[in-house]
Swiss-Prot record:
The keyword Mitochondrion does not apply. It catalyses: (8S)-3',8-cyclo-7,8-dihydroguanosine 5'-triphosphate = cyclic pyranopterin phosphate + diphosphate. It is an enzyme of class 4 (lyase). It comes from Xanthomonas campestris pv. campestris (strain ATCC 33913 / DSM 3586 / NCPPB 528 / LMG 568 / P 25). This is Cyclic pyranopterin monophosphate synthase. The keyword Endoplasmic reticulum does not apply. The lineage of its organism: Bacteria, Pseudomonadati, Pseudomonadota, Gammaproteobacteria, Lysobacterales. Gene3D superfamilies: Molybdopterin cofactor biosynthesis C (MoaC) domain. The active site is at residue 135. It holds the Pfam family MoaC. Homohexamer; trimer of dimers. NCBIfam families: moaC (TIGR00581), PRK09364.1 (NF006870).
């Protein structure tokens, strides 16, 4: 029988079906981590141009700017996603590199010691970094595509998901 990976209940709805923030005050404080990925797909000519320019655009260093924007997004996730708790982020790391001739892979890993996980922070960081890459390159093409964006792993809560990074 496969491992259970979902809950039968939506945690952000109360008994009356109204939206609510989950009360984590009784949860155990543990080391938490999550890793998420997003990808940016480029037309062949744009990918070739970016490779030739060392991932620099007219706006500056693409990777450097994406890391800064993604990090800022991680720290502000609770301001963007209504029921995310503000968390003391202990670490945020990005790996950005080519994953094929035309695909830039963005991996964001977030760590904290708290009562709730950092999945949304990792997903937000990877997403905003991908959006920043798009913004940095849109002068070259508007046919770039972002996705998929997905959670690769999480550690430290009720259940671990995916391979640790």
């Amino acid at each position: 029988m496969p491992a259970k990976t979902t809950s039968a209940r939506l945690t952000h709805l109360d008994d009356a079906g109204l939206p609510t923030m989950v009360d984590v005050s009784d949860k155990q404080v543990t080391a938490r981590s999550a890793t998420a990925e997003s990808r940016v797909h480029f037309p062949a000519a744009v990918a070739a141009q970016l490779r030739a320019n060392g991932l620099r655009s007219a706006k500056g260093g693409i990777v450097e700017t994406a890391v800064i924007a993604g990090t800022m997004a991680v720290k502000r996730t609770h301001e963007l996603i209504p029921f995310c708790h503000p968390l003391p982020i202990d670490g945020c790391r990005f790996e950005i590199d080519w994953a094929g001739a035309q695909v830039l892979q963005i991996v964001c890993t977030v760590r904290c010691v708290h009562r709730t996980g950092v999945e949304m922070e990792a997903l937000t960081g990877a997403s905003v970094a991908a959006l920043t890459v798009y913004d940095m390159c849109k002068a070259l093409s508007h046919t770039m595509r972002i996705g998929p964006t997905k959670l690769l792993s999480k550690r430290g809560g009720k259940r671990d998901i995916g391979a640790a990074r």
